[in-house]
Amino acid sequence: MPELMKLIEDWNGYVALSDVNKGENYEQQLKETIDLLSNANHLPPHKHEYLLREALTTSDFPYLFGDVLDRQVLASYKAVDPVWKQFVKMSTVKDFKTAYRFAITGGDQYLAEVAEKGEYLASERDEAKYELAVKKYGRQFDISWETLINDDLGALKDTPERFARAAVRTEHRIVTALYARNAVTYTAAHGNMVATALTIASLETGLESMAAQTDANTEPIMNRAKFIVVPPALEMTARQILTSATKVWSDNAAGPAAYPTNNVVAQMGLTLVVDPYLPIIDTTDGATGWYLFSDPKDIAAIEVAHLSGHERPEICMKASDKVTVGGGAIGPMSGDFATDNVFYRVRLVFGGVTEDYRATYMGGSTL
């Protein structure tokens, strides 16, 4: 099980778990567990197998092994850098109640001239409110006691990676669903959509439209697109647009049919983001839709949050419901009473909301 051992030995991204119910020798016990799993002492195969089998029946090993799995999931989860993190604002909430985000605009409009002995005009302000709530997501899996015994824990070697991928995919789906063809965010009244395929001309229109957005007092908000998000089907088109030095456009009938000119879009510093979930979430325009986003540090179109203290996927193990005939406790690795299966569960708490429509723009051929 080299994959499992590699993850065990990779302590990058390690975050100490809660110290509740951990003895003062906990870290030493955890190290001994890792040494046993990885055979750090280079024991002969038959002795290593014997010690593993013995460990499965002890009371400490199941919990320590579960902690190892938990840390592996964290390492695998943090090793992935989802593309959506570039164009959304990230935060935390303290509970499952609806959290409110307020955006105050105004108060910074131009100063009005004040006549001699005249009154100063009041500074007008406007307030926008957004509701953000997180939800709980998860799955459980079970492994038969026989499999654990026969496979020397090899059956669990890719479990951390699978759980980490599941968490990453869940977050990605949620984020993409927030903006993909969002009929509330993208409207003609908002001036942030166009029913045109991705071209240099349509991208110029999008950039100009975002730059022209104003606040409630018709003051410019100095808005500028930083990211262009496309599905895999448009990646090559987007790259060609962003790297081409020249473009060709048609002139009037009296002049030449077409002539080259500079492609200024390539000079705008847009960052290309390819979202593979766009065609999955948006079955209508997912292959042809394209999006622009401002820098979320300036103006956020989307905000996502984890539950505070639970910013990563978490694994827990089901305690055994069996006891010995004499009434003694049996460790979780012995499985449940009915089937002898050993149960694990992964949990993720996550949520998001769309915020300022002026921080994004949508284009597509079938809008």
Enumerate the language-model features and the residues they cover.
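Assembly/oligomerization interface modules of large self-assembling protein complexes
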Residues: T57-Y137
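Intrinsically disordered, low-complexity terminal tails
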Residues: M1-D60, R358-L367
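Alpha-helical scaffold segments that mediate packing/assembly in large oligomeric complexes
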Residues: R139, I143-D158, R162-N217
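A glycine-rich phosphate-binding loop feature that marks nucleotide/adenosyl-phosphate handling sites
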Residues: A180, R224-P231
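Short, solvent-exposed loop/turn segments at the edges of secondary structure
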Residues: V134-G138, N223, T339
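Short gly/pro-enriched beta-turn/loop segments at secondary-structure junctions
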Residues: A216, P220-A225
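Short alpha-helical segments and helix-capping/turn motifs at coil-helix boundaries
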Residues: R71, D126, Q213, G328-I330
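Sequence/fold signature of self-assembling virion shell proteins
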Residues: G191, A197, T205-S209, K226, ...
